């Protein structure tokens, strides 16, 4: 009987461990910190767990081979070509907006923003991406220690994650949802490419809904980091998703202007609002147009942080969009398209 009980006990422990490994946030919410400490006490050393929720797992490049090239050499050549064709560097990016669709659609556009990254100035990259696969209230950070790309692994900055966690405004990503989400991953090969051999860390942040004053809350938190010129913010967002499959297809049926140009005009109104660096202007634009900009909340966090940062110092801030395109030129109501734009925040000392 004692052998049977021991076997059952081990089975339960292994089950709990697998639950923990798959979803640390869920485990800690369900079983609580005391039980996690108990497991840490009785498990062999190879199964020890980090009680702050951060572990030694590596997030795979789950969209490589489908959304972008999985071959290191071919991907590197592709990124090099796009970056070489993106024109001259006109400044040093403090933050940027980049699309997150398959590279065949948006890689060229993304390159215009990443061309403005000066690797020697950057030690840490914050990546704010919208959640497409799970309903999330607020923001969540990763429990993984590395993010894999075909160009090499990117190291997660757990020191910053612990600081963010201490604010009590950040949840932990579920690992299965994290693997499925593409908005952060699609920025990583470009980051790896432009940073090259420079030593740096990343801080992936998944952004959900931001009701009430939460835009300002997160903006104030990230303003502290945006003030530091060693930090780069990458904001992941596509622009208009137009068509019946997106449940969004407004256009003026009486206008002679093609639908794709009407979409362009709507997007560029939003881009102009972002370039003012006024969160209220962008919020008003979204309420007026209901434009399906999936990264609206990461963009709003950036705008709130930039506003707080701008008020607290004597620097001049400039946001400039550099490239815009659409996946398809919509000419009839049965067509569909997604818009892509890239832009950069420059900070100039006075």
Swiss-Prot record:
Listed InterPro entries: MEMO1_fam
Family per record: Belongs to the MEMO1 family.
Matching CDD domains: MEMO_like (cd07361)
Pfam family, one: Memo
Gene ablation phenotype (knockout): 7-38% increase in lifespan compared to wild-type animals. Increased nuclear accumulation of the transcription factor skn-1. Increased resistance to oxidative stress as indicated by an increase in the expression of genes related to the oxidative stress response and activation of the p38 MAPK pathway. Increased reactive oxygen species production. Knockout with bli-3 RNAi rescues the enhanced longevity and increased reactive oxygen species production defects. Knockout with rho-1 RNAi suppresses reactive oxygen species induction and longevity in the memo-1 mutant.
Identification of the protein by name: Protein memo-1 homolog
Cystine pairs: none
Assembly mode: Interacts with rho-1.
PANTHER family: PROTEIN MEMO1 (PTHR11060:SF0)
UniProt tissue specificity: Expressed in neuronal and non-neuronal cells in the head and tail, pharyngeal cells, spermatheca, distal tip cells, anchor cell and the intestine.
Gene name in the database record: memo-1
Entry function: Plays a role in the oxidative stress response and the maintenance of longevity by regulating the interaction between GTPase rho-1 and oxidase bli-3. In turn, this serves to modulate bli-3 activity and the control of reactive oxygen species production. May control cell migration by relaying extracellular chemotactic signals to the microtubule cytoskeleton.
């Amino acid at each position: 009987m004692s052998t049977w009980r021991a076997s059952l006990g081990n089975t339960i422990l292994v089950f709990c461990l697998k639950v923990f490994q798959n979803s640390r946030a869920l485990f800690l919410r369900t079983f609580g910190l005391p039980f996690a400490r108990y497991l840490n006490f009785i498990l062999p050393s190879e199964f020890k767990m980090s009680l702050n929720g951060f572990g030694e797992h590596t997030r795979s490049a789950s969209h490589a081979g489908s959304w972008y090239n999985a071959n290191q050499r071919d991907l590197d050549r592709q990124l090099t070509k796009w970056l070489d064709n993106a024109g001259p560097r006109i400044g040093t990016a403090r933050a940027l907006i980049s699309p997150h669709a398959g590279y065949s659609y948006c890689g060229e556009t993304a390159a215009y923003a990443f061309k403005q990254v000066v690797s020697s100035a950057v030690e840490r990259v914050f990546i704010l991406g919208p959640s497409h696969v799970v309903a999330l209230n607020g923001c969540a950070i990763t429990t993984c220690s590395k993010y894999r790309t075909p160009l090499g692994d990117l190291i997660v900055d757990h020191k910053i994650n612990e600081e963010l966690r201490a604010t009590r405004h950040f949840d932990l990503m579920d690992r299965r949802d994290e693997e499925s989400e593409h908005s952060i991953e699609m920025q990583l090969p470009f980051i790896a490419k432009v940073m090259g051999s420079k030593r740096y860390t990343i801080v992936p942040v998944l952004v959900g809904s931001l009701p009430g004053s939460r835009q300002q809350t997160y903006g104030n938190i990230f303003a502290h980091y945006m003030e530091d010129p060693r930090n780069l913010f990458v904001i992941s967002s596509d622009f208009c998703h137009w068509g019946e499959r997106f449940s969004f297809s407004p256009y003026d049926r009486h206008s002679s202007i093609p639908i794709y140009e009407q979409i362009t005009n709507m997007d560029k109104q939003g881009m102009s609002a972002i370039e003012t660096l006024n969160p209220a202007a962008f919020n008003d634009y979204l309420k007026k147009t209901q434009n399906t900009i999936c990264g609206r909340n990461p963009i709003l966090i950036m705008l709130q942080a930039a506003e707080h940062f701008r008020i607290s110092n004597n620097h001049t801030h400039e946001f400039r969009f550099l490239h815009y395109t659409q996946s398809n030129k919509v000419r009839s109501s049965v067509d569909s398209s997604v818009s892509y734009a890239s832009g950069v925040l420059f900070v100039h000392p006075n």
